[in-house]
Amino acid sequence: MIAMNESISQIDYQQVIINILYMFTGGSVVFGNICIIGTILLFRHLRCRKELVMVSGQCLGDLLYGFGFLVGGGRRLYLFLNHMEKVPVSPWHCMSAEVATFFYLLGPQAGALMNLFVGMDRFMAVTFLNYYSKLNSTYVVGAIGAVYLYASISYGVGFVLSYFMPREKTVVLQCLSTWASTPSYAVYYTALITTAEVTGIVLYVIVMLILKYRTMTSHPSLQHAHHKRQTKITKTISLVVLSTFLFYVIPWLTHSALNALQVKLGKAGLISPLLWVLIQSNNVFNVIIYLWKLQERSGPGVHTHEPNGHRRHERNFVSEYKS
């Protein structure tokens, strides 16, 4: 009985709570992004819009990242409850045997690059109006495919580098994402995500300045009508960008700095795990924003009392946003 009480007292309940939060936020992100992607694919007048298909590609990256937190949080919770969190393993074990590592490394890279591409898409939409209106689904599929191809190759490079690392048991079975890679790959991984996110935010600042200038100087015309329509989705995504900056980029940079300083500080306590929870909370906020706006856009095309009204309204909606 005494041994059992000692075993129970050794459980790190702070880490148990943190990993439950990981699972909760990760599960919320997965569920929310499935709803967003499903809504866009379900309604034809939504999936015919280039910018919304691009958003669905962005949400896929967040979904992968959230799934990594869901699986990884469950795995670590099991380890802490069974006193296995400090079992030594090699980085290669983390890369090859832990499912969550795949999502931890692939999801953030794909999500950050998609944020950058969405920013570039919005920049083209408000700057090169005529050119953007002529782009078709090939452009969107190509952009999303290029992002996920690059992210997959990038993950593959990390996988190969980890294979050639010494098989010494230098990490523990918790297998935090960057522990599975070489130091140089960890630097590249952090730099890629940070650069893509910050560049996307800078692009959005430029886009909002262009929109403000156009609003002040524009006059009634077909081009102005297109500008007004593009402004709606741009303002929606700008809310997501603001949320990303406050609750993703700043915590991400802080977490990266803590990782670099942990060699000197020794232990970051609860700060680092709570930053990860905050980062995932950003994805929850983004899900709420997108679902709120998609609900407004999906409603009109569904409620109709005319036999063919839905199809006619849908075609008008599509033609309106293709102009």
PLM regions and their residue ranges:
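Seven-transmembrane-like multi-pass membrane architecture, highlighting hydrophobic TM helices
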Residues: 1-323
